[in-house]
């Protein structure tokens, strides 16, 4: 059986200034519960918990997870 992934960590590194990282809650009402703004080169390590079901990244950033790495892009 697979292990509990509720405590997985995500590393997010801003490529440009103004990257928004937003934590979304679990439950019948999905809400924002935390927001951070990163400048170029800043890194945040986020964790999925019993309260955090999703993390939204807006802007140019590299996102590393246990599943691999992906790069987000800013709107053009």
Swiss-Prot record:
Keyword RNA-binding included in the entry's annotation: yes
SUPFAM superfamilies the UniProt entry points to: TRAP-like
BP terms from Gene Ontology: DNA-templated transcription termination; regulation of DNA-templated transcription
GO MF annotation terms: RNA binding
Keyword Ion transport listed: no
Signal peptide (from-to): none
UniProt cross-references to InterPro entries, sorted A to Z: MtrB, Trp_RNA-bd_attenuator-like_dom, Trp_RNA-bd_attenuator_dom
Pfam family, one: TrpBP
Ranges that cross the membrane: none
Keywords: RNA-binding, Transcription, Transcription regulation
Purpose: Required for transcription attenuation control in the Trp operon. This trans-acting factor seems to recognize a 10 bases nucleotide sequence in the Trp leader transcript causing transcription termination. Binds the leader RNA only in presence of L-tryptophan.
Assembly, per entry: Oligomer of 11 identical subunits arranged in doughnut-like structure.
Family: Belongs to the MtrB family.
Family matches, as HAMAP family: Trp_attenuator
Protein name in the entry: Transcription attenuation protein MtrB
